[in-house]
């Protein structure tokens, strides 16, 4: 399979022309999945029977001349923290190992209404807390470009699924970079929409004011198509914005001549920024300039305060959200408890992994009496200042540009005993979540060792259309993936 022929529009045309059936397309991807899965450990659940049944149903509908949705017959994967009715949703945690949701998340429901076919639920860091997909209770996922390296996290399974060709596209969630960082590490496109652009109904909550659902794809155009399907108001989610959804594909081919691209100074001065990443991202900026965009250096003085701010706010919200897992109504329950109190404490101690427990403790401490003003409230104040820095920057530019991650994918186990080093992998993505802005990671190069590098483009609130336009124009001009190194598990 050539990645240039693996786009949604290309497959849709082949399906409409009768060059391939939905069943044949699904079987191709299942075969690819079954070949790669023993090496990659991408999936927590593989839904072969459901996928084939859905494909057969769509083929019958097509033969009967029925109207079909824009994703009809296309195999998709879903991060295993989005509820799928009748299919296990585990959050890669022992706590929810056997949980089968009785309802469907809004985002996935819209995919199925558009004709998408579920091939499986993808691995993640437990409860989406991590940056490497190593904290999963079911084992780590590996990077398709180099099995000794991580795929990023927390949506590492969704990124690796697209990169390895076991699905055409996938969904992930992004709380502090969990779509964009894995997209960078795995050499795919990852889009985090504006907070509230996509419903969070049915997304198992980590940090409710930061979480957002978004797509992984092999191209910017595919990401635009997926966003078109999943975006829009939802009365079941009070934080979902009640605003019209524009046509995200309409402006992709428009010139970016005259647009102003802000290069955030603090990001290129960041401690620990890899030299190859710096060079690749600066080359991406130069490519945009060659396309007619104007590069403007801008300052976001509090950008690098994002990490400290996030690691007060996100654990605080996690502490509250995960309080529901007590072994009483559903989820893991410890055996042989002598009382309700010991049953609850034992269930949480045995059901949650080390990283989840660490973040719950941090959050509980930050919210405790005597510390809430010094930590949580102060962090919220800094969050406001970070947002104001972005507001000021967008007064003079149309989009912002940074590296997606400070380095290419690191080796598995490299940060096992140093959680702070792991947290710093999201240094360049976290501020975007704190401000609720849309951002996209697009491949922009490779390291000397053959690992992908991503450039992050950041848009203003609800300006995904322009963000996608700039990203698409860059992608088409740079054509980075045509010069990619060979990797046995990347088609």
Swiss-Prot record:
The active site is at residues 79, 154, 178. One of its GO terms (biological process) is translation. The keyword Methyltransferase does not apply. It catalyses: L-glutamyl-tRNA(Gln) + L-glutamine + ATP + H2O = L-glutaminyl-tRNA(Gln) + L-glutamate + ADP + phosphate + H(+). The keyword Protein biosynthesis applies. InterPro entries: Amidase, Amidase_CS, Amidase_dom, AS_sf, GatA. One of its GO terms (molecular function) is ATP binding. PROSITE patterns: AMIDASES. It comes from the Bacteria. Keywords: ATP-binding, Ligase, Nucleotide-binding, Protein biosynthesis. Signal peptide: none annotated. GO terms for cellular component: glutamyl-tRNA(Gln) amidotransferase complex. Its EC number is 6.3.5.7. Belongs to the amidase family. GatA subfamily. Allows the formation of correctly charged Gln-tRNA(Gln) through the transamidation of misacylated Glu-tRNA(Gln) in organisms which lack glutaminyl-tRNA synthetase. The reaction takes place in the presence of glutamine and ATP through an activated gamma-phospho-Glu-tRNA(Gln). Heterotrimer of A, B and C subunits. This is Glutamyl-tRNA(Gln) amidotransferase subunit A. It comes from Synechococcus sp. (strain CC9902).
């Amino acid at each position: 399979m050539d990645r240039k022929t693996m786009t949604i529009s290309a497959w849709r045309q082949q399906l409409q022309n009768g060059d391939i059936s939905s069943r044949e397309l699904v079987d191709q991807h299942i075969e690819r999945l079954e070949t790669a899965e023993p090496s990659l450990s991408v999936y927590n659940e593989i839904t072969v029977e459901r996928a084939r049944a859905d494909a057969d149903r769509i083929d019958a509908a097509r033969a009967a001349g029925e109207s079909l949705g824009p994703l009809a017959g296309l195999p998709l994967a879903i991060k295993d923290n989005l509820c799928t009715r009748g299919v296990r949703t585990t959050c890669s945690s022992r706590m929810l190992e056997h949980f089968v949701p009785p309802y469907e998340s809004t985002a996935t429901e819209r995919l199925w209404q558009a004709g998408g076919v579920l091939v499986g639920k993808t691995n993640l860091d437990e409860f989406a807390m991590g940056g490497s997909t190593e904290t999963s209770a079911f084992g780590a996922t590996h990077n398709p470009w180099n099995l000794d390296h991580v795929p990023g996290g927390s949506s590492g399974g969704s990124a690796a699924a697209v990169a390895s060709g076991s699905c055409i596209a996938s969904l992930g969630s992004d709380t502090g970079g969990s779509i964009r960082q894995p997209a960078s590490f795995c050499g795919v496109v990852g889009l985090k929409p504006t907070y509230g652009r996509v419903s969070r109904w049915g997304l198992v909550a980590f940090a409710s004011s930061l979480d957002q659902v978004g797509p992984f794809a092999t191209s910017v155009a595919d990401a635009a198509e997926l966003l078109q399907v999943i975006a829009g108001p939802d009365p079941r989610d009070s934080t979902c914005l009640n605003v019209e959804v524009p046509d995200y594909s309409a402006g992709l081919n428009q010139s970016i001549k005259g647009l102003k691209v802000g290069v955030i100074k603090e990001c290129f001065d960041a401690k620990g920024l890899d030299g190859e990443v710096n060079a690749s991202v600066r080359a991406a900026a130069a490519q945009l300039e060659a396309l007619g965009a104007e590069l403007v250096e801008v300052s976001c003085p509090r950008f690098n305060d994002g990490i400290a701010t996030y690691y007060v706010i996100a654990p605080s919200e996690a502490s509250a959200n995960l309080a529901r897992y007590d072994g009483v109504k559903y989820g893991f329950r410890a055996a042989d408890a002598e009382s309700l109190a010991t049953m609850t404490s034992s269930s949480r101690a045995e059901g949650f992994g080390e990283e989840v427990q660490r973040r719950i403790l941090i959050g509980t401490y930050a919210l405790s009496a005597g510390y809430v003003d010094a930590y949580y409230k102060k962090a919220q104040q800094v969050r406001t200042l970070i947002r104001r820095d972005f507001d000021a920057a967008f007064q003079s530019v149309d989009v912002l540009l940074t590296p997606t991650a400070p380095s290419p994918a690191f080796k598995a186990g490299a940060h096992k005993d140093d959680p702070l080093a792991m947290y710093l992998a999201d240094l360049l993505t976290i501020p975007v979540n704190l401000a609720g802005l849309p951002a996209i990671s697009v491949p922009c190069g490779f390291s000397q060792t053959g690992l992908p590098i991503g450039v992050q483009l950041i848009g203003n609130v609800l300006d995904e259309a322009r963000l996608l336009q700039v990203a698409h124009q860059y992608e088409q001009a740079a054509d980075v993936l045509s010069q990619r190194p060979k990797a046995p598990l990347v088609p």
